[in-house]
Amino acid sequence: MFNQSYLNVYFICGTSDVPSHRTIHEVLEAALKAGITLFQFREKGESALKGNDKLVLAKELQHLCHQYDVPFIVNDDVSLAKEINADGIHVGQDDAKVKEIAQYFTDKIIGLSISDLDEYAKSDLTHVDYIGVGPIYPTPSKHDAHIPVGPEMIATFKEMNPQLPIVAIGGINTNNVAPIVEAGANGISVISAISKSENIENTVNRFKDFFNN
């Protein structure tokens, strides 16, 4: 069952996103201890794990999340999400159609990336629990990212559909969250702001403060 508070501090990470002196297990556990509300396993890039290695890691990270009662979401990979019985899946505009995914994930969380009004107009949101809007700011984490849309895009979507849960993504750090919250976002999703933080507990707590009112 989806709760929009899951979106408050949404951590996204894969093996290529963590510094060389840490493992993804260490980074995730530190983030979980600090109080992230949702985790998405996003294994991308040239060095990304594949096949059984990816499956094994996904199971380990899923187990870690469940120890802290945090839902585990898989990015894009429908077969992996089904195989490990993930708590949900997040897809982009170029990935499998949401309607097709929904038949496999009737009781799971489904998220969809939307960057602009055109994508919003052509997206079927019938089975979608939340949308990820961005990039809000310039981001180094996604080389294929769109042009930054700014917090204004969140405000526009909220005006069009006030009940639609929205999580912001792209270039977000603890210094630029306020305009996102003011625009009406239900949460923020970050990669490097947490994965490369020198003090994960402090970073997560600062993010949480914006949504604890």
UniProtKB/Swiss-Prot annotation:
Its cofactor is Mg(2+). Condenses 4-methyl-5-(beta-hydroxyethyl)thiazole monophosphate (THZ-P) and 2-methyl-4-amino-5-hydroxymethyl pyrimidine pyrophosphate (HMP-PP) to form thiamine monophosphate (TMP). This is Thiamine-phosphate synthase. Keywords: Magnesium, Metal-binding, Thiamine biosynthesis, Transferase. Disulfide bonds: none annotated. Binds 1 Mg(2+) ion per subunit. InterPro entries: Aldolase_TIM, ThiamineP_synth_sf, ThiamineP_synth_TenI, TMP_synthase. GO terms for molecular function: magnesium ion binding; thiamine-phosphate diphosphorylase activity. It comes from Staphylococcus aureus (strain MSSA476). 4-amino-2-methyl-5-(diphosphooxymethyl)pyrimidine binds at Q40, F41, R42, E43, K44, N75, S113, K142. One of its GO terms (cellular component) is cytoplasm. Mg(2+) binds at D76, D95. Its EC number is 2.5.1.3. Pathway: Cofactor biosynthesis; thiamine diphosphate biosynthesis; thiamine phosphate from 4-amino-2-methyl-5-diphosphomethylpyrimidine and 4-methyl-5-(2-phosphoethyl)-thiazole: step 1/1. 2-[(2R,5Z)-2-carboxy-4-methylthiazol-5(2H)-ylidene]ethyl phosphate binds at T139, P140, S141, G171, I191, S192. GO terms for biological process: thiamine biosynthetic process; thiamine diphosphate biosynthetic process. The lineage of its organism: Bacteria, Bacillati, Bacillota, Bacilli, Bacillales. It comes from the Bacteria. Belongs to the thiamine-phosphate synthase family. NCBIfam families: thiE (TIGR00693). It catalyses: 2-[(2R,5Z)-2-carboxy-4-methylthiazol-5(2H)-ylidene]ethyl phosphate + 4-amino-2-methyl-5-(diphosphooxymethyl)pyrimidine + 2 H(+) = thiamine phosphate + CO2 + diphosphate; 2-(2-carboxy-4-methylthiazol-5-yl)ethyl phosphate + 4-amino-2-methyl-5-(diphosphooxymethyl)pyrimidine + 2 H(+) = thiamine phosphate + CO2 + diphosphate; 4-methyl-5-(2-phosphooxyethyl)-thiazole + 4-amino-2-methyl-5-(diphosphooxymethyl)pyrimidine + H(+) = thiamine phosphate + diphosphate.
